[in-house]
Amino acid sequence: MKIKDALIKAYSVLKETNDEFYMEDSQILLSYVLKKDRIFLITNREYEIEENSLKQYFDYINMRKKKMPIRYITEKCEFMGLDFHVEKGVLIPRPDTEILVEAVLEYIELNNYKKVCDVCTGSGAIGLSIAKYAKDVEVLCSDISPDAIRVSKINRQGLNLEDRVKIENGDLLEKPIERGEKFDIVVSNPPYIREDEIPKLMDDVKDYEPIIALVGGEDGLDFYRRITSMSKKVLKPGGLIAYEIGSDEANEVSNILENEGFVSIETRKDFARMDRVVLAVRGGL
């Protein structure tokens, strides 16, 4: 089968599922199978696809038909201009999370911060991106999920950051607290979706992405309360705490931080002009 015919067939399959990106998804998956870029598909529409590659392609199309996210099928995701390995068991990094990373990098440059802890690291996208772009910074990436630890270690190796990034399995900040370790920054994209919102999520999210990385308790704020309280034991005075938040959680998260003695609380918006990041500084001496 030629490229043009394979794409037409794939378009038809995915269009039936109301996938608004059916053409893009079909092209991404064929590019992945053929190990060619999408320009090749456009300029070589008469190219004959080998039988084994064709079978693999339509296996992937059927996975996408069942709403499996493209990033889980290809096990690849771009974040902050870097390539990350992702798979089922870890959350797929979102473009909006880049705003959190950029805010942290800004504070590092302004304050010469040297030590960062990324809590609920998942694939390691946040902590590893910070380490990649802030050359003098040491980062600890922590997660309770063994899958997250394994995947983040793959990404650490892929980005050649073994010398400055430590990855450990643990519950939030418990292990750093036990060691008496101190940080200039605690950053986290914790689970923040309310329990009653889970059934309303898109199928590709609720059916495939790990629930442990999504649910933030009855009101979505459980992890903000815990991390904020624990961070006072590891953050240096004047240190930064940086959160990704749900678009309706800015006031509640800001109140949690204020009640725990944090100051200079700031909210930043995402690409859709929705509240997405809250930053605060630990007060005291």
From Swiss-Prot:
Signal peptide start and end residues: none
Pfam families listed in its UniProt record: MTS (PF05175), PrmC_N (PF17827)
Binding annotation for S-adenosyl-L-methionine: 143, 189
Coiled coil segments of this chain: none
Enzyme Commission (EC) number: 2.1.1.297
Reactions accelerated catalytically: L-glutaminyl-[peptide chain release factor] + S-adenosyl-L-methionine = N(5)-methyl-L-glutaminyl-[peptide chain release factor] + S-adenosyl-L-homocysteine + H(+)
Electron transport keyword on record: no
Any Gene Ontology biological process: methylation
Keyword annotations of the record: Methyltransferase, S-adenosyl-L-methionine, Transferase
Domain of life: Bacteria
A molecular function GO annotation: nucleic acid binding
Residues at which substrate binds: 189-192
Alphabetical list of CDD domains matching this protein: AdoMet_MTases
Function: Methylates the class 1 translation termination release factors RF1/PrfA and RF2/PrfB on the glutamine residue of the universally conserved GGQ motif.
Similarity comment text for this entry: Belongs to the protein N5-glutamine methyltransferase family. PrmC subfamily.
PANTHER family reported in the protein's UniProt record: HEMK METHYLTRANSFERASE, MTRF1L RELEASE FACTOR GLUTAMINE METHYLTRANSFERASE
Protein name according to UniProt: Release factor glutamine methyltransferase
